[in-house]
Amino acid sequence: MGNQTDRDSVPSAGVSFMSARRVAVLYGGISEERAVSLVSGQQVVAALREAGYEVTPVEVGADLRDTIAALTPAPDVVFNALHGRFGEDGAIQGVLDWLGIPYTHSGVRASAIAMDKAAARTAFLAAGLPVAEGRLVTVEELAEQDPLPRPFVIKPANEGSAVGVHILHEGDNRRTEIARRWSFGGQALVEEYIPGRELTVGVLNDRALTVTDIRPRSAFYDYESKYAEGGSRHILPAQMHPDAFKRALDVALAAHHALGCRGATRSDFRYDDTRGEPGRLVLLEVNTQPGLTPTSLLPEQAALMGMDFVSLCRWMVEQATCRA
């Protein structure tokens, strides 16, 4: 069965704790994931204050000028606790590079590619990583006919937290209605549906942490399952064939590097073991801004490896950088 990696594999800090004292925490934002970011931000603010930093919470809204004003004078580091559009897609990263302020998590390019699921899929294919069959389709194409054999998944190309995701099985007649109500741009990403289990692997720079087996209370690991208390059960380390366990760690690390990520990421997988073990492992996406809420997966994995939440947040601050 699967085993966690050694505790001494958790990466050490890149710079000294004393080199950064003043930290601004960006949270909230303008995406569909604003509510999640508000919770993440509050958790991070409390943790960094406990760690001894001077913390300025900055609730981000629609006016960029307000955010820039809140970062003047510049802090030593910006902790990016935003999720979704503007916070996770390279936009705020570009602003912070322009301002010359070091920030946590990935830079502009990696963030932009990871947020664009079709672009990320292309990068994963180029790196030889296992992905589901799929393609981009226009909303008009989706309305006219099934783009893939059923069952298949419809998802926005640029959203996270399972926002806007639909699974269509045989006999499900919602396709036309989904296309009519689609509010995520003129295209959708459709992929074959992979049966089996939902897995995730956290990565801190050059180390994959462990594999979590996610058991949602509902049939689908949706937004409610991700963030509601009791919405899902997390089994870590995942109980699975050791070869598949190691493969998940290796693919997560390779995906992190394929996109050029830095700091913390979390790779999500489907694992089809319906025909026995070892099963088929399929990479879904890399999250460059993993959730930091009380039910979030990355903090759980870090804790299993001996890194509590305060230490995890401190580590993220110590890894902060920019391209200015």
For each of these PLM feature ranges, what is it?
Residues 2-3, 14, 125, 242-324:
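ATP-dependent carboxylate activation and anion-phosphoryl transfer catalytic cores
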Residues 124-125, 148-163, 185-199:
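ATP-grasp fold ATP-binding core
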Residues 1-109, 113-115, 119, 126, ...:
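ATP-binding N-terminal substructure of ATP-dependent carboxylate-amine bond-forming enzymes
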Residues 137, 165-171, 202-205, 272, ...:
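Short beta-strand-to-turn element immediately C-terminal to the catalytic PLP-Schiff-base lysine
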Residues 37, 132-133, 152-178, 198:
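Glycine-rich phosphate-binding loop of ATP-grasp-fold ATP-dependent ligases
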Residues 170-250, 278-282:
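Phosphate-binding site of ATP-dependent enzymes
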Residues 55, 102-103, 131, 152, ...:
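Hydrophobic beta-strand scaffold residues
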